């Protein structure tokens, strides 16, 4: 209660006639609730607006908001490090995959024949008794259609 009296003497514009709630709080202070001996302490709270400015205000134990001296505006600390979200990381990986796919589209991919393909190729040639010169003996060229 002494802090309220000193705040009124510091600010002549905030008189009892301008603020009728001040007189009501003086009446409440004489109620038996505050006579239990518990002191009302002020707690500082920080609020941040959309521009990133921090405002510090004080709230008493009874729930009333009071000024803590003057309201400070402290800009938030901005970090220089860019943190990637998982969505950005996935997009970046997709871009890399697309670039590698384009490289594979330009170069022809040599297909490796499985053992079953080799045996099928040999049995068909053996069935028709096709004479094979040494140039056509390589099956991979015929499968990849490079010699035709």
UniProtKB/Swiss-Prot annotation:
Region Disordered, residue ranges: 1-96
Gene: mei3
Biological process (GO), any one: cell cycle switching, mitotic to meiotic cell cycle
Signal sequence bounds: none
Role, per record: Acts as a critical meiotic inducer by binding non-covalently to protein kinase ran1/pat1 inhibiting its enzymatic activity. Inhibits ran1/pat1 by acting as a pseudosubstrate for ran1/pat1 instead of its natural substrate ste11. Inactivation of the ran1/pat1 protein kinase is both necessary and sufficient to divert a vegetative cell from mitotic division to meiotic differentiation.
Disulfide bond sites: none
Protein name per its UniProtKB record: Meiosis inducing protein mei3
Keyword terms, alphabetized: Meiosis, Sporulation
Basic residues composition bias: residue spans: 75-86
Biased composition (Polar residues): 1-20
């Amino acid at each position: 209660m002494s802090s309220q009296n000193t705040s009124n003497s510091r600010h002549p514009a905030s008189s009892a006639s301008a603020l009728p709630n001040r007189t009501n709080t003086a009446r409440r202070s004489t109620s038996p609730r505050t006579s239990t001996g518990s002191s009302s302490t002020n707690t500082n709270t920080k609020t941040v607006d959309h521009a990133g400015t921090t405002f510090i205000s004080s709230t008493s134990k009874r729930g009333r908001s009071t000024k803590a001296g003057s309201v400070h505006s402290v800009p938030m600390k901005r970090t220089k490090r860019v943190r990637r979200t998982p969505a950005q990381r996935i997009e970046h990986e997709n871009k890399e995959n697309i670039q590698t796919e384009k490289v594979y589209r330009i170069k022809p991919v040599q297909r490796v024949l499985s053992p079953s393909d080799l045996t099928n190729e040999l049995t068909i040639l053996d069935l028709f008794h096709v004479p094979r010169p040494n140039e056509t003996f390589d099956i991979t060229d015929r499968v990849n259609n490079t010699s035709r």
